[in-house]
Amino acid sequence: MQRADLRNVAIVAHVDHGKTTLVDAMLRQSGAFGAHQLLTDRVMDSMDLEREKGITILAKNTAVRHGDLTINIIDTPGHADFGGEVERGLTMVDGVLLLVDASEGPLPQTRFVLRKTLEAHLPVILVINKIDRADARPVEVVDAVYELFIDLGADESQIEFPIVYTNAREGRAALDAESVGESPDLKVLFDLLVERIPAPTYEEGHPFQALVTNLDASPYVGRLALCRIRNGRVKKGDSVAWCRHDGTIQRVRLSELYVTEALDRVDAPPEGAGPGDIIAVAGIPEIMIGDTLADADDPQPLPVITIDEPSLGMTLGVNTSPIAGRDGKKLTARLIKSRLDAELIGNVSIRVLTTDRPDTWEVQGRGELALAILVEIMRREGFELTVGKPQVITKEIGGKLHEPMERVSVDIPEDYLGVVTQLLSMRKGSMESMTNHGTGWCRMDWLVPSRGLIGFRTEFLTETRGTGQLHHVFDSYHPWLGELRTRPNGSMVSDRSGPTTGYALTNLQERGAMFLGPGIEVYEGMIVGENARSEDMDVNPTKEKKLTNMRTSSSDHTIPLVPPRQLSLEQALEFIREDECVEVTPATVRMRKVLLSAQDRGRKRGATKALV
């Protein structure tokens, strides 16, 4: 049976191709908001971090009306680091809008989200967005998408997809690229969506079944479980069977039942919700993602969602620096552990493992960005942390050590072709293909070890003067490629505590790039700059000028201080080596040696050489 009055669709794309902007336009044109309402751009991006970085981190759903139909739209992240959100989003829908930039074309993350879509056997509508760009090339982009479908092993029915061209920012859509400017609205897209995305199917008379795909919390009713109803009906106050991961089944009562209208959760109608509806239920405090809610008298669990394995890990623990506790309020191991446990409840793509230290844990995820976002969120919540260098997660396959490889796509001006090729070759990358668009820009596709990309972005942007674009996504596990040295320069390490002085920094800036200005409190073992040479250098950034009562024939020369290079959290995590870590507080991000004392570091170096 089908529910003709409902459609469930996910919007998937590479990061920053305009998914959230398109949802904004669909909400406005469906009458979801009153004409008097003032809306921010990207209303679906509700987290501060999402607005700051211009990316979607969490999968969210909204509902719009089109005539007599309700269309549930899932806005998924375009970044593979948040792939767990993409996979969960796809379990809730019957079709997909694949959004591709009219100029950039399909990129590695497009490949990632499309692969997930094809594995789920979902029909696709191709949306070529940003058609108003001066460098738009819709014909070539459509051809590239066809090639991507074939490359990913799509069958004939999947390759026969309809195409619509849009300008999401202005809310226009048309069936050919030239007509987009004349189109008044997105009606073409809405009509195509209703026509080509199948209505939810269900079995008549089948007992109630719903799979929990996400969790949320309300200050009034506690934990909310978000699920899509597969079969049957349910209403507020019903008793249902809660089928857990471990196979146990418990009878529970649904204290609240909500459905989505535009961006708001509202009480479900008195008759409840039926097959295909995306609902939020309250009344089960310990429910987890992947659990099934089923008929109390005939419980039939649904298959659990499979999530890709994490490929990167880093240690995260209590702040152990000499000046810990000055900025944050949450300092203890107990608070950090309870926060990580809370993160595990809603974030299925990370794992938390114990280490040999009781105040430190290993957090594993899909990539640097996902892990850095978690640390940034905790920092804003008042935590102080010590964060280790991100390390790849290796596997034993057939008795041999294997490491994760990433598919890398770079768009660069032709002038930087040589230097970027050299950078990626040094990191044991192998070039797969190179395309010259004839516009002075070229695109290269590489296969590079994940560990070779740690710290690569900053160097890449420096060498291309900020013009290059870099995108990468996990590909597969390959045999270990041997030793890899990624950072050629050493660190400048403070050899004592105290405030930095302009006099000391003036002398030190000749030796390398400084990370701090004058008047900043430092401690022994803290990294204050990047050495121009390959080895580490212990320095005194607190040195003051000696004053005498002797007059000299020449006055002091004024040497201007170069402004310090201030690193963000992501840049700091990329910069550090294995024997270094990042100190994170609500106010600052500092880098330091794991062993603060110069004597301890010297002893360890001596012991390492003796072993060799």
Give the ranges of each region predicted by the language model.
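Structural and coupling elements of P-loop NTPases
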Residues: 1-612
